[in-house]
Design a protein with these regions (language model features):
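C-terminal alpha-helical cap/extension of soluble enzyme domains
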Residues: 3, 7-12, 32, 36-38, ...
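Short, acidic Gly/Pro/Ser/Thr-rich loop/turn segments
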Residues: 15-16, 186, 266
Length: 286
């Protein structure tokens, strides 16, 4: 298993009724996830609504989770930015706070060319002695990092892994541990000998996804049984469905900050059906 773990949950950021970061809720959720299948947590990533957190909030969430888990599970801090100086700043601060690794997305919106991408990651790598996990998600960033570019980035000393959310690039790259960036890619990544996944559905079916790692002979059967959950988590923009699911299950993670909005009735029904099909709502209300 990777030093970061196999099942890494991309944790939501709980908010209170005024959409302030719920610090107690953050700690509770972190403990719940680690108790239910997660080897580690990725905080302040896409699912954690990092783009609508202030830097103070962002770093506070990292601080809370690192302090709470205290070596019981790994903490990967999402610190990516399309501003290299800002990414360096967040990297330095997250390193000081004790994060085990740093997740860095491809710079988005300004869409740098290949040389710019390499320079960006060279600069952030200089800012830490911790492992860096690259994050390739062209559907959000507008830029794909093909495997030959990933191989070049792997030459940077502390660039050690990639969260791959482009299924067309799903192949091992020398020098990089491979993590599934989508729930429905986990089985394929594990079959390829990859490290695991950075996942959303593990908020609600973490123990089942853990079994996909521990029981390779049953992996495909388990994966097939979870397709409705994966689909529900993608019923609309992440993290809208997973926050809806957690609230239905009694975890009280609150709403979302604009421009994201809460699930509508149709989306909520999809999420509810998936939870009910696995007996999760019955368990939560028992």
């Amino acid at each position: 298993m990777s030093g970061l773990g196999a099942i890494l949950t991309a944790m939501v950021t709980p908010f209170d009724a005024q959409l302030r970061v719920d610090e107690d809720g953050t700690v509770r959720l972190a403990n719940h996830l680690v108790a239910h299948g997660s080897d580690g947590l990725v905080v302040c990533g896409t699912t954690g609504e990092a783009t609508t957190l202030t830097d103070v909030e962002h770093l506070r969430v990292i601080e809370l989770v690192v302090a709470e888990l205290k070596g019981r599970a790994t903490v990967v801090a999402g610190v990516g930015s399309n501003d290299t100086r800002h990414a360096v700043h967040l990297t330095e601060k997250a390193t000081e706070l004790g994060a085990d690794a740093l997740l860095h997305v491809t710079p988005y919106y300004n869409r740098p060319n290949r040389r710019g991408i390499v320079r960006h990651f060279e600069e952030v790598a200089k800012a830490t002695d911790k492992p860096i996990v690259l994050y390739n998600i062209p559907a959000r960033t507008g830029t794909d990092m093909p495997n030959d570019l990933l191989a070049e980035l792997a030459q940077i000393d502390n660039v050690t892994a990639v969260k791959q959310a482009n299924p067309d690039n799903l192949a091992p790259v020398d020098g990089l541990e491979l993590y599934a960036g989508n729930d429905d890619m986990l089985a394929d990544v594990l079959d390829l000998g990859g490290a695991g996944g950075i996942l959303v559905a593990s908020h609600v079916v973490g123990e089942q996804m853990r079994r996909m790692v521990d029981e390779p002979d049953n992996r495909r059967t388990i994966d097939a049984s979870l397709q409705d959950v994966y689909a529900a988590m993608g019923a609309t923009t992440n993290p809208i469905p997973v926050k809806a699911a957690l609230n239905l299950l009694g975890h009280a993670v609150g709403g979302l900050r604009l421009p994201l909005v809460e699930a509508d009735e149709h989306e909520l029904a999809i999420v509810r059906r998936a939870l009910e099909s696995h007996g999760l709502l019955a368990t939560a209300s028992a």
